[in-house]
Structure formats: C-alpha cells, structure tokens
C-alpha cells in the first residue's frame, strides 16, 4: 500500500551510516586471511558468526569431517510463508593466495587509498558477502517481514573448485538449503 512505501521513505536508514558500517565490516573481514590453498576458513566463519550473533540473526556452522579447515556458515532471515522455498544468497569465504611482491600494500590490511579499499578478496568476493550480510542486517533493523525466507550461505573451497565447497553442502545438507533461487556473484 502507499502507506507502507511512505513509511519506508520517511523512516529509511541513514545511508551514510550504512555505508560507513559496510566499509568497516568489509575492512575487518579482509583482514582475516582465508587464502586457499591452504584453505583454512575457520577464522572467516568465526568472524561472520560473530557479526550475525551481534545482530540477532540465527546462523549455523558446518564443519567438513574430512578436512576441519573447511567450514561453511548458513544464516537465516525467516519469512512469513513457510510454504515458499527460500532465496539463497551465496558467497565464498576463501580467497586466492596473495603474491606479496605484486602488492603495493599489505593484502591483509585493507587500506583505503583515494577512496578505494585494497585487500585480498575485496573484489572476489568478500565484498559480496558483506553486501549480502548487510542486507539481512538492514532488513532486520527495519523490521521488514519478507514473505519468503532469505538465507545467507558462505562456503569454503571455491577458489580451487574443491570437493568441500558448495558441492559438499548440497550433498550433505540440501534439506537446509533447498532454494527457489540462488543469488551469487554471477547474478540470480
């Protein structure tokens, strides 16, 4: 209804504050070395879990029994209609190892130079993970109740197309995913 849209317009978040918070979260996340190889994403999963917990968003972590360095995190923003399959926001936690000689900054310090954040994973793909996370945080803060559940899935092992990434989650935990749509770096 028009009242709903007017309420959103006049009660919209402080977008400058949202941008500042997003930048700070991205910088923190970029400082977590999740290079693959070796593929140890435990600190990345712990960091994501901490942020979800701080914002009261339900999440679950999954350890790969064959390789405990590989973990995944699934957060959920519940919808009002349990008959609808969820929208899955998919991203990966691991990054390609940094060639320090090719960097003019420390790739794990997330420096801002001339308005640009420099850090391993800034483009591929920790920035998308933060955008997806911030979407859930903002929806929760604004009191939005989606009809369809929205899930955030951060996975390991993408950079080497390993067997313990999203394929492992599909094989072992499809019942927790089962999405209608998946939104990742390639689109919807």
Feature locations, PLM:
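Bacterial N-terminal signal peptides
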Residues: 1-7
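Short linear interaction motif-like sites in intrinsically disordered regions of transcription factors
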Residues: 5, 16, 48, 104, ...
